[in-house]
């Protein structure tokens, strides 16, 4: 019984330490740089709105399994938070059309581009806004 308790406590301790580290890793500059490489077809080291929308459109098509032209919460797999759902779904029909999805990508692109140069680099992708954008692109 003591061994089982010790194993449980050890596992809980490992999870307590590793889960926050994993969330930091996903937003780290190296993760963002890796993601950027797959989203940057012209290899200029940045993602512009056209590239972001192309990636988002491809992901939308991949996620849209029931062919009704929209994504619901289930199909989005948590890519849009409950807090942000109203922004992504302005007609409040509980689904996001491709046009709404791409409009939301544009909103997040602007948030992820604090210097307003029209492009998003790896550092900007590693920000919270950049991370939210990545969830809609990959």
Regions from the PLM with identified roles:
Residues 2-20:
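Bacterial N-terminal signal peptides that target proteins for export
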Residues 40-44, 64-68, 89-93, 113-117:
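Acidic carboxylate motifs that coordinate Ca2+ or other divalent cations, activating on Asp/Glu
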Residues 51-58, 73-83, 99-107, 122-132:
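Amphipathic regulatory helices of Ca2+-sensor modules
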Residues 112, 117, 121-126:
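Short, exposed beta-strand-loop hairpins at the edges of beta-sheets
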Residues 136-138:
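Short, solvent-exposed mixed-charge patches
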């Amino acid at each position: 019984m003591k061994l089982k308790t010790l194993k449980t406590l050890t596992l809980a301790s490992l999870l307590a330490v590793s889960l926050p580290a994993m969330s930091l890793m996903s937003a780290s500059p190296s993760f963002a740089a890796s993601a950027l490489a797959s989203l940057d077809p012209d290899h200029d080291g940045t993602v512009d709105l056209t590239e972001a929308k192309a990636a988002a459109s491809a992901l939308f098509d991949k996620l849209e399994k029931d062919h009704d032209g929209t994504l619901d919460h289930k199909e989005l797999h948590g890519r849009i938070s409950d807090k942000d759902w109203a922004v992504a779904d302005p007609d409040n029909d509980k689904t996001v059309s491709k046009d709404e999805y791409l409009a939301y990508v544009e909103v997040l692109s602007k948030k992820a581009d604090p210097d307003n140069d029209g492009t998003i680099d790896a550092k900007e992708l590693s920000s919270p806004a950049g991370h939210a954008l990545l969830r809609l692109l990959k």
